[in-house]
Amino acid sequence: MLKECIKIEGRAFLGGKVTRVKLGSGECKTLQLSNKYLILPGMVDIHVHFRDWGLSHKETLRGGAAAALAGGVVAVGDMPNTKPHIRTADLYKKRLEEGSALPIIYKVHMGIPQDLEELRAARPPTIKIYPEDVEAFGWGHIEKAAEACASLGCRLVLHCEDPAYFKEGERPPIAELACVERTRQMAFKTGVKIHLTHITLSQTAEAARGWATVDATPHHLLLDVENCKDSGLCHVNPRLRTPEMRKRLLAAFASGLVDIYATDHAPHTLEEKRSGAPPPGICSLDVALSLLLTLWKRGVVTLSDVVRLYSHRPARFFDLQIDVKKGYFTVVRLEEFTVRGEEFAGTCKHTPFEGFKAFGRVFATSVGGRIYFKDGDVYMINI
């Protein structure tokens, strides 16, 4: 972090209104802002993959945190498909302890264990279910986990694709729709809270109303099989859809049917992505806020939508208080720029958004009143 504290003054936008924001004491250095800057609550990304452990060649906790700070993100929810997979209370607690050293707020979704007593020992607020878990354990075990989760007051986060519909490497849209219906029945039977992550279909957003929350990613909102044809960089699960499907999802997103915006930031090495069998995953955490602000600039969403989708609702998801006045904020310069992966702050330096004209470049990020990112530089000297 910067050694001196920072006070922000000046006419700047806060939640769509021109205002003056002061943080810090009179001795603090003052950061003067003009109307060319936007002050927003810090962003919260509930779906990231910070890898590390046996996958540190792809990404590390430190690298992931750097990408978050560069993207205006002050809190994240990390996924459990690490190496080893986080399926035990001991691994869950170990990961949380390691993440506590980061300058951002760090949460972890626990993986589903074979022995459900591990859930009672860990008492995680969220459990992540993958299609591979359905293949490994069966829907019966998933339902037992849902019952245990309901009794503990936690939430199931599902990558909702039914593997029964996977065929010859293809994952058709029907796999998502079938999983949604099966999950709906499970939710009503067990009473468990459900969140469907990285949905790709407007029908999913509509079907989830009343019993589940949903999120959508920047790549499923902006990229499709026609405008993203790089077989490596564009390879992701769930798959990118047709332009028509993408546009319908974007319309659902703009209408308020989608609760949360989340990246599914999933780094792999460029060599892996350029191989004959590229692993699925897209890097976008550094620029996800800018991509969302681009939709605001285009008139697709409002500024209130931006804050609701990427700060307020995901903060509520983790029961966090993310408030500008408490020092959790990001400062955005209102300018257009070209996305360049080589400029990313995290370990991952490649993205299918390469060359994309985005709007709103993150200038500074504060966590708890401390500036950890400013004008292209990340400050993490204490870890």
UniProtKB/Swiss-Prot annotation:
Catalytic residues (UniProt): D264
Enzyme class: hydrolase
E.C. designation(s): 3.5.2.3
Pfam families xrefs: Amidohydro_1 (PF01979)
GO terms for MF: allantoinase activity; dihydroorotase activity; zinc ion binding
Pathway connected to this protein: Pyrimidine metabolism; UMP biosynthesis via de novo pathway; (S)-dihydroorotate from bicarbonate: step 3/3
InterPro entries linked to this entry: Amidohydro-rel, DHOase, DHOase/Allantoinase_Hydrolase, Dihydroorotase_CS, Metal-dep_hydrolase_composite, Metal_Hydrolase
Cofactor-binding details, from the entry: Binds 2 Zn(2+) ions per subunit.
Family annotation (PANTHER family): ALLANTOINASE
UniProt-listed GO biological process terms: 'de novo' UMP biosynthetic process; purine nucleobase catabolic process
Alphabetical UniProt keywords: Hydrolase, Metal-binding, Pyrimidine biosynthesis, Zinc
Cofactors named for this entry: Zn(2+)
Residues binding substrate, per UniProt: H49, F50, R51, N81, H268, P280, G281
Protein name in the entry: Dihydroorotase
GO CC term (a single one): cytoplasm
Function noted in UniProt: Catalyzes the reversible cyclization of carbamoyl aspartate to dihydroorotate.
Record family assignment: Belongs to the metallo-dependent hydrolases superfamily. DHOase family. Class I DHOase subfamily.
Catalyzed reactions per annotation: (S)-dihydroorotate + H2O = N-carbamoyl-L-aspartate + H(+)
Modified residues (N6-carboxylysine): K128
Residues annotated as binding Zn(2+) 1: H47, H49, K128, D264
Lineage: Archaea, Thermoproteota, Thermoprotei, Thermoproteales, Thermoproteaceae
Record carries keyword tRNA processing: no
Residues at which Zn(2+) 2 binds: K128, H159, H198
